[in-house]
Amino acid sequence: MVSDFQSFQAYLREKQVFDRFGLSRIGVFGSFVRGETYRDIDLLIEEDIPYQQLISLREMLEKDLQKPVDLMLKRYAEPIILRRALQDVRYAVK
């Protein structure tokens, strides 16, 4: 079970998520990264990846983590929402 940022980063590496989906890093923000009670895990994806891969990534994460996962693509994010996310984002890196 993933309970904090460090265990989430270890999970991503173990599952080879970065290589499987062509990502160099994944931003984690929101209540999960702040260590508060969380209902879902909010992720910021900076690279452009095909829509089907994005769906596959979300489905895999939700199945494995047993939590809803919200993915925000930086390129398409509303500026106000992105600015808020960037205030507490932590990056899990390959």
Question: Which residues does each predicted region cover?
Answer:
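Catalytic core of pol beta-like nucleotidyltransferases
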Residues: 1-27, 33-38, 46-94
